């Protein structure tokens, strides 16, 4: 959902994207390229804008992406969880099992062609909620280090109404359940070294 920037909530696919960082700009550039290829060459496309996806088999050693994995890796190493600002910024954290079925089903679905879809949770949660869920999944008290706030969108979540209209409504995994599943996987595999770039 990085393409949206700080727009109206919930973010909807028909809003004009206003990405604020290189990550969001790059994602939007790919969408524009796909649309141009459709117009010029007849290439069909399907774009998914997933919401803060986390889950088993994720690279938890990447210190720049995915707060759930970062928190788990730190907890397993006895380090505090780094929270930027007050931790009250919200995101719609979405377990991978809530995203993957849409991707699998889209190819055979004619109604999905040449369309952009938001996919993910419609229940925004704070970063502090994530810290609490991770600590609970590991059976520890949350230890948090507050870092200076970053220049980022404070609240980000989007509507999945278009996705539900095309793919149907699906049961979603709660943050707590998803974190428990990922924590069970992480405990089996252990912490990962973090690249210090």
Language model features with spans:
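Catalytic helix-loop patch of NAD(P)-dependent Rossmann-fold dehydrogenases
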Residues: 2-47, 59, 63
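A conserved pocket-lining segment of Rossmann-fold NAD(P)-dependent short-chain dehydrogenase/reductase
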Residues: 14-18, 45-59, 70-94, 118
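C-terminal substrate-binding subdomain of Rossmann-fold SDR/epimerase-dehydratase oxidoreductases
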Residues: 75-197
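Conserved sequence/active-site signature of Rossmann-fold short-chain dehydrogenase/reductase
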Residues: 1-3, 46, 53-55, 67, ...
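Conserved active-site helix of classical SDR/Rossmann-fold NAD(P)-dependent CH-OH oxidoreductases
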Residues: 28-35, 39, 69-72, 100-101, ...
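Active-site proximal helix/loop that lines the substrate pocket
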Residues: 2-6, 52-58, 88, 108, ...
């Amino acid at each position: 959902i990085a393409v949206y920037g700080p727009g109206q909530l919930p973010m909807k696919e028909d809003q004009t994207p206003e990405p604020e960082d290189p990550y969001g700009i790059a994602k939007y550039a790919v969408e524009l390229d796909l649309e141009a290829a459709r117009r010029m060459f007849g290439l069909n496309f399907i774009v998914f804008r997933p919401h803060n996806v986390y889950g088993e088999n994720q690279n938890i050693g990447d210190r720049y992406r995915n707060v759930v994995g970062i928190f788990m890796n730190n907890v397993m190493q006895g380090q505090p969880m780094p929270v930027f600002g007050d931790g009250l910024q919200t995101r719609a954290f979405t377990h991978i099992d809530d995203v993957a079925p849409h991707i699998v089903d889209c190819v055979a679905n004619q109604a999905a062609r040449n369309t952009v879809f938001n996919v993910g949770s419609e229940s925004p949660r704070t970063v502090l909620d994530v810290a609490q869920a991770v600590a609970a999944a590991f059976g520890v008290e949350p230890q948090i280090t507050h870092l200076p706030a970053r220049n980022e969108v404070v609240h980000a979540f989007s509507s999945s109404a278009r996705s539900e209209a095309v793919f149907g409504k699906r049961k979603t995994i709660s943050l707590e359940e998803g974190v428990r599943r990922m924590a069970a996987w992480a405990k089996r595999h252990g912490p990962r070294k973090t690249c210090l770039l």
